[in-house]
Regions:
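Donor-binding and catalytic core of enzymes assembling or modifying cell-surface/extracellular glycoconjugates
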Residues: 2-91
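Nucleotide-sugar donor-binding patch of glycosyltransferase catalytic domains
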Residues: 35, 45-49, 80-147
Length: 147
C-alpha cells in the first residue's frame, strides 16, 4: 500500500492509539516516508521500528497491540495468533488463500477488480489499481467495525 495512505490512517488514529511503524530492512524507506508524513501532520506519538526488530522482538511488539493495520504479510499472521484486531489490505494477492486464520477480529479491505488476484508484485496491466484504489477512508471504515 502507499506510504501517504498509511500515514493518513495513522494520523487519524493517533488521537486514540499510539502508532508503531513496522517493516523489514527492505521497507525502511517506505517507513521513513510514513514517519515524515506523520511529522508534517504534527503526530508525535509514534515509533518507527522498521528494520530495527528481530523476529522475537516483532512478535512481542505485535502481541501487545490494540489494533494492527497491515498488508498481506507475515506479521499479519502473527497478529492473528494473538487475536489482535486487524485490518488487512489486499491487492494482488488472494485473500481466500492467505488471509488471517482463526482471528474473529479481522477485516479485509480490498477492491473487487476483474484482474484480482493476479499474484504479481508488479502489475501486469501497469496500473496497480488494486492498491491505488484502496484509500485511507476504506481502512478507517473497517477500523470502526471494531469500536
Amino acid at each position: 500500500w502507499y506510504p501517504e495512505e498509511f500515514a493518513q490512517v495513522a494520523a487519524e488514529l493517533s488521537e486514540k492509539y499510539d502508532i508503531v511503524i513496522f517493516g523489514g530492512l527492505g521497507e525502511v524507506d517506505i517507513a521513513n516516508d510514513i514517519e515524515k508524513s506523520l511529522i508534517e501532520k504534527g503526530v508525535t506519538n509514534y515509533q518507527n521500528l522498521a528494520g530495527k526488530t528481530t523476529i522475537p522482538e516483532l512478535i512481542n511488539q505485535i502481541s501487545s497491540l490494540d489494533l494492527f493495520i497491515t498488508g498481506d504479510s507475515g506479521p499479519m499472521h502473527i497478529a492473528a495468533t494473538f487475536q489482535i484486531p486487524t485490518v488487512a489490505i489486499f491487492g494482488p494477492t488472494n485473500h481466500d488463500e492467505t488471509s488471517q486464520w482463526m482471528n474473529e477480529k479481522s477485516m479485509i479491505v480490498k477492491k473487487n477488480l476483474e484482474c484480482q488476484p493476479c499474484m504479481k508484485r508488479t502489475c501486469p496491466l501497469k496500473h496497480h489499481n488494486c492498491m491505488k484504489m484502496v484509500v485511507a477512508s476504506d481502512v478507517l471504515r473497517a477500523v470502526k467495525t471494531f469500536n
